[in-house]
């Protein structure tokens, strides 16, 4: 008589899933040249397969739930709005040990150099004035800034108070971006000049807009707070730190 224990089978229905990556935009589908993004959905009690981006660096941004990310023999715990920079060609896994389904945004850009992981805590950074830029009716939070080493990526959050608009409108010669809206409802325009302003859309939770170089890209909030991720690929600077006129609102438009 065999001593091997016989285990029961498992039925996996056609629509069952435990961990999934949703590709939201690639360069070929978004008119960008460096930047792509997607989302990870992780059910309770699930650990992902090993993940690896062989020619890209990445940043994870936790939108819902709480997860453990294992990278380079370290474990980082991410909860609401925490972020983690994943260096070029660095394996990692994501584990959801909580009862709630987790949602992470992942932004990626091609890279040549390999740096260290960098974890940023929303609880800490949202109170650290060195990480905050205060503008009229809105605050910008720098979660992955120039103080951290990366090839192309920078990222953070912007929170608009109700009935606020971007001012001044600005564009970039050396950066492309994606905005991913995480709370509230608003609107966004993207245009090269006023005469060709045809991209005007309402936005709500988890909508996103890609911003190729030289496009102005103002955002407008409505009757509630509007939160969004901004992720940059290209030259590493934040517009208000490079051009102080942006902070002062001295011009209607500016270019960096």
Locate predicted features.
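A short, N-terminal "cap"/entry segment at the start of jelly-roll beta-barrel domains
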Residues: 1-34, 49, 101, 107-156, ...
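Conserved short histidine dyad/triad with adjacent acidic residue
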Residues: 20-26, 36-54, 157-175
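Short, conserved beta-strand element in jelly-roll/cupin
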Residues: 41-42, 52-69, 109, 159-161, ...
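Short beta-strand His + acidic residue motifs that chelate non-heme Fe in jelly-roll/DSBH
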Residues: 48-50, 69-70, 78, 86, ...
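Short acidic-glycine-tyrosine-enriched beta hairpin
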Residues: 72-88, 193-214
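A short hydrophobic beta-strand segment most commonly corresponding to one strand
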Residues: 85, 99-116, 158, 210, ...
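Non-heme Fe(II)/2-oxoglutarate
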Residues: 234-256
């Amino acid at each position: 008589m065999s001593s091997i224990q016989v285990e029961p089978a498992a039925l996996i229905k056609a629509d069952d899933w435990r961990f999934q990556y949703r590709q939201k935009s690639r360069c070929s589908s978004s008119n960008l040249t460096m930047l792509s993004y997607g989302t990870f959905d992780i059910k309770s009690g699930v650990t992902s397969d090993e993940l690896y981006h062989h020619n890209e660096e990445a940043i994870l941004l936790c939108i819902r739930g709480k997860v453990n990310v294992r990278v380079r023999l370290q474990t980082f715990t991410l909860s609401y709005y925490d972020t983690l920079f994943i260096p070029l060609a660095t394996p990692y896994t994501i584990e959801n040990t909580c009862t709630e389904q987790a949602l992470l945004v992942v932004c990626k850009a091609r890279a040549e150099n390999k740096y260290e992981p960098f974890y940023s805590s929303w609880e800490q950074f949202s109170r650290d004035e060195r990480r905050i830029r205060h503008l009229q009716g809105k605050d910008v939070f720098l979660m992955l800034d120039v103080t951290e080493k990366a090839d192309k990526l920078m990222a953070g959050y912007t929170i608009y108070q109700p009935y606020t608009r971007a001012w001044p409108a600005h564009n970039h010669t050396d950066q492309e971006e994606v905005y991913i809206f995480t709370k509230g409802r608003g609107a966004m325009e993207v245009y090269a000049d006023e005469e060709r302003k045809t991209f005007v859309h309402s936005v709500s939770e988890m909508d996103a807009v890609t911003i190729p170089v030289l496009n102005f890209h103002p955002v407008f909030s409505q009757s509630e707070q509007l939160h969004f991720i901004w992720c940059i690929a290209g030259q590493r600077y934040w517009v208000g730190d490079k051009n102080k006129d942006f902070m002062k609102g001295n011009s209607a438009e500016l270019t960096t």
